[in-house]
Amino acid sequence: MSYTFGNQDFQLRLSERNGAIKSITFHGTELAAPSTGMFTLRMYLHETGDYRFFQAEEFPKFRREGELLLWSGHPEAPEFTVGCRITFDGEFFRFRPSLRHVPGEMWADLIEMPQLCVPLEKEIFWPHGPGCLIREPWKSFREYHHAGFPGNSDPCVYPGSASVQFLAAYGSRYGLYYAADDPTHSIKTMEIGPAAGSSVRLRIECTCDRQGMEQEFELPFDLVVGAFEGDWMDACEIYRRWMKHDPIMKRDFALPDWMEESPVVIIYPVCGDGRITPEPNRFLPYERNFTRLKELSAALDSPLLVLLMRWDHNGPWMPPYYWPPVGGEESFLTFCDKLHKAGHRIGLYGSGTLYTRKSRIHDYSTEEEYRKRGLERFMARGPKGEVDARICSNIRQGTELCITEPWCVDVMCEQVKLVAEHGVDFFQILDQNHGGESFVCYARDHHHPPLPGVWQTRAMAKLIETMRRTAAATGNPLLIGCENVAAAPYVAQMPFNDRRNPLVYGQEANAVQYLFHEYANNFLGNESSAWETIRCADSPDNLQLRLAMSFVRGEYLSFTLRDSGEIDWGAAADWSAPAPEQQPVLTLAKQCNAFRRKYRKFLLHGTMQKPSVRLECGWYELKLRKRDSEFLPLVPTGAFRAPDGEEAQFLVNFRNRPEPVRLRSDRPFTLETGESRTQFPAGESALELPPLSCGVLLFSHEKED
């Protein structure tokens, strides 16, 4: 027997025995797999600092009171009652969790409700970084991660390493959409995990903030389950309709003019090689590489944004103190002056909201300052009051800054001010805060509740805004950026970031560019995981493939360099291994960036949309080190709608050979490739793309009066 919600087309069935989801059907198609329970709670024992997990199966008494489901009778806390109000609004099933009679020694820390499972064979969209379609072994065996202390890259936390607050699972026609309808963008874990019967659990764990300290608590927003026809892009359209009215997407400052010229981002370290070490390399003094940069600019026919890694005076990745640059301020400023006079830009990496107490790779230490100034009182604390930091702990020993504490904000802004005053155009100071992630803090004497929650999102948004205003006050309004794509509530404030490829987990499904391209154009990034993920020698065109995919997503192009001046596979590649073949990469990038500048109304200012022209082409086998190969189209494509309503679809042949492709279109179009323009009628067409080339399909458009 079951409780049924919904209508004839879209139906939810719950177990009468324990309230678990048994079935979700859409137009007669089953979208879900049976779940064993409805919820998981993580309670915080505030006297001891321990966690206590509760599963729905531990509450033997279950009943329904109209729209409200209630669980109670736990043997350790008989009065403790968990509730969920379920409604159907014609489009979504809405779940509103609540707690009553919470035991006095506990605070509500995390709530996962409902527990939603899907069959293993479904394609699963996971919002890790830009978004990905998760693959094995992660799909079947991913561990159950939770937001917590200290911060690390394992759990997918929103807003942060999770860029949006929805997941999706779909088959050949229909799919399931699972999201938090939370306009405050509070902290959540956006995860998956193995479930019973060859199924996967789509997991949204919500934090409780100050309200979690009460004995009665209701989550202030709904979790929603909807259905769609199509794939991950159609799921994105649901989220886009919700997000476009969010006032957080409004930007209150002008973007710098140099973004209009689409500089190619050239990334390299001035210390170490593919490994992080403190020894200077051949990129120092800074001016030494200027001749090579001039050559690259000429070969690409483009201005450059030179983005330096491991430049900080105290050694690579030793926050929060960076200035002056390693190699000397005089050399650095001379280099900046040369770049600016040649029409280029300069950017720097930072290392986020972290504090280094001691380096593990050389003799740098701040232990004396830390002790004498009593800085520990400003640091983020764990559930037992401990201080720690796990991120980059192989490089440094340290702690995390609590960004509600004025001293921590001041030290971040002080570094931004120094960098801005010296003419830098872009500062990725939130590297290691993936997507702008703010770290959990349980301190009871800081300027926030002693539980994770929406205060973290608000504090990070305020920090980003304060850093930006600090830079603007110097007369140099440099851009602030983060590692990976900026998560949704920070997109407007950080429109230019170092996108990271989620290839280690699955095939990229770039929801961030799809949803937010008109607000933010990220760049391909330093691709630090490429070498450890891709068998580069066995997939020699893989860098060209990555450039092509970046271009059709509307991103700025970027390369990393070795100190030989060669373009590399990525920032962490082995410099003793052969570099990529150079000329094909440069030829392709020049073609793509010329198109990017010519069609900036699409590729810089446009809204990404689902391609209307269907392409049939061959497949490229991308050979990977730790999982099965990915097979990706030999002709990547992406479609955009310009602000004036005109539409275009871009395509790329990234290999050094002609590539046949068949196009199916419901309307006529004009194909432009280089200097060639050819008109095609609606229907099916066959053509051959030249080697290392890009093209655009243009559709007739009547402008509105």
Map each language-model feature to its residues.
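Carbohydrate-recognition beta-sandwich/jelly-roll modules
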Residues: 4-305, 338, 342-345, 426, ...
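Active-site-proximal substrate-binding groove within the catalytic cores of carbohydrate-active enzymes
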Residues: 205, 216-222, 456-675
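The substrate-binding groove and active-site-proximal loops of carbohydrate-active enzymes
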Residues: 264-287, 314-329, 393-411, 445-459, ...
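Short, acidic/polar
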Residues: 281-296, 408-420, 543
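Acidic/aromatic-lined carbohydrate-recognition and catalytic surfaces
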Residues: 306-380, 459-482
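Active-site-adjacent "subsite" loops/lids of carbohydrate-active enzymes
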Residues: 331, 337, 345-419, 504-519
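Active-site neighborhood of glycoside hydrolase catalytic domains
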Residues: 400-493, 507
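C-terminal beta-strand-rich structural cap/linker in extracellular carbohydrate-active enzymes
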Residues: 681-705
